[in-house]
Amino acid sequence: SLVGSEMCIRDSLKPLGTTQQHLMDWDVEVNGGKIVLETVDYHGNTVHLCNQYSDVEKIEITCCGRVNVIDTNGIVGAHDNHIPLPMFKNATALSLPGPRLRQLGKDMSKFMRAGHGGEINALHELSARVSAAIKYSKGKTDTSTTAEMSMEIGMGVCQDHVHAFITVARCLDYSARYVSGYLLMCDGETQDAS
């Protein structure tokens, strides 16, 4: 719920349909306002613009639906959006490699040259090494924490693992980008995830 006199809200609450993720049904409801525009962003995500009714103090946006997901161990297939893949080789403020991440990149280069099962296996190994280096711990980092800072303190959450992973993947000359969404936990709870 949000409080205010009048506002326009941008939301991305509809899952992207892919070969691994099929939307069976999905509904976005706006109480205290209405969806005035549904469009698609440059990644192919559905985006809504919602206006709050001027005579209400609160707007509540909820979504509900069913998604059939096929587990492909993180392999999504061919690139299918309009942004050229080399764009995802560029570092961001949160994914600049420092000494720890550069060292992990060197270690992974050695792993790959030793022929341990190809690129996909190497990227799964990178994921495992990042998880080992950054122990999952809430409250130790925030949205401004860089990948190198997470490696330095050795703790973080999903976003920190992702930033470290994409930083090293880019050092290895792979195109990699941050993707966020929602994660359904085993106990039925949902949380933001990356």
Predicted ranges, named:
Residues 2-9:
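Short, small-residue-biased leader/transition segments that mark boundaries at the very start
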Residues 5, 22-24, 57-61:
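Residues at beta-strand starts and edge strands
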Residues 6, 20, 70-74:
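Intrinsically disordered, low-complexity acidic/polar segments
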Residues 10, 27, 60-64:
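Beta-strand secondary-structure signal
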Residues 15-50:
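Solvent-exposed beta-strand/loop surfaces of large extracellular or lumenal domains
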Residues 52-56:
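Short, solvent-exposed beta-strand/turn "edge" segments of beta-rich domains on protein surfaces
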Residues 62, 67-71, 76-77, 82-156, ...:
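Secondary-structure boundary elements
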Residues 113, 128, 160-194:
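Hydrophobic/aromatic-rich core segments of domains that either
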